[in-house]
Amino acid sequence: AKNKAMTQWEYLPPLLSGNCVNDQTERPQIYFQDGKYYLFTISHRETYADGLQGPEGVYGFVGDGLRSDYKPLNQNTGIALGNPINLNFNPGKPYSPDFNQSPYTFQSYSHYVMPGGLVESFIDSIGGNKDGNPVRGGSLAPTVKLNISGDTTSVDRTYGTNGLGGFADIPSDRARSNGGDTRPQRLK
């Protein structure tokens, strides 16, 4: 806003854009840690420009201020947390060889990076039934935790069970912890 009454506005340039690379970066989140600004956003494989591809997942960037030159995390890949292209087929196979099969089995999306590095996601399909068809999940995915340091992130494998916490493990009523505790917590 250009005034305190918030009746005049000015458009500012985007914090990050993927022109000619990716036409969709969504759910941007700013995370502050150790004097750095971390910008996380999500994207999808099918939103990359022709001839380019990347995994569905969380992409992260680090800068010295809100309006700084953000640099991609993890050796300039930007990938902070990604899904395999398709868990149903071996690498190198077509993306979706059978249009009746969900290419998203066991895959999560719509990630949200929270303070402390916890990541909530949504999951569509959670494996297959006895016929091998995906079972609809339609729910929050298991929580994971990212370790964030400098220009690097990694999945915290000590969180939960080998890096996977409980479904919707959001410790909003307790101090930040290592997490992964799926027992009910009493509100204080």
Where are each of the predicted segments found?
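Carbohydrate-active catalytic/glycan-binding domains of CAZyme proteins
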Residues: 1-188
